[in-house]
A protein has these predicted regions:
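Positively charged n-region of N-terminal signal peptides that target proteins for export
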Residues: 1-5
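Bacterial N-terminal signal peptides
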Residues: 9-19
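Electrostatic cytochrome c docking/interface patches
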Residues: 22-48, 124
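Axial heme c-ligation environment in periplasmic c-type cytochrome domains
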Residues: 35, 64-72, 91-124
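A generic structured-segment signal
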Residues: 40, 53-54, 85-89, 96-102
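The canonical Cys-X-X-Cys-His
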Residues: 45, 49-59, 98, 113-117
Length: 124
């Protein structure tokens, strides 16, 4: 009986350790926006957004279609919004009409656009 209790406790400890390592790894691999909170660069990002993205996502990201409404990134993806943005913009989603922008736009430009998008997130 004691041996079974020890095995169960060890299994729980291993499970908790795996979850903690997975959460830490996920957080460690999440990209970091170097311009987050910079109002001037957010304004530049808005202009860049209107130049490169607005034909599908609307001027100033005001697109009513939910799949393309980038004001809802935080609602849809929570803490993973930054990863979803960077991955989608970098690698595209050709099946949904999203082109690959990596190599076309610099990382600096992508982060300025994301900095702008951080300022227009909606709560509903």
């Amino acid at each position: 009986m004691f041996r079974m209790a020890v095995l169960i406790a060890a299994a729980w400890a291993a499970t908790i350790l795996c979850v903690c390592v997975a959460v830490a790894a996920d957080t460690a691999t999440r990209p970091v926006n170097p311009y987050s909170g910079n109002a001037q660069l957010a304004q530049e990002g808005g202009s860049l957004f209107n130049q490169y993205c607005s034909h599908c996502h609307g001027q100033w990201a005001e697109q009513g279609e939910r799949p393309r409404d980038l004001r809802r990134l935080r609602i849809r993806y929570g803490d993973d919004a930054i990863s979803m943005f960077y991955t989608t913009v970098s690698t595209g989603r050709m099946e949904k009409g999203m082109p690959v922008w990596k190599g076309v736009l610099s990382d600096e430009t992508l982060w300025k656009i994301f900095t702008f998008l951080e300022t227009v997130q909606t709560e509903d």
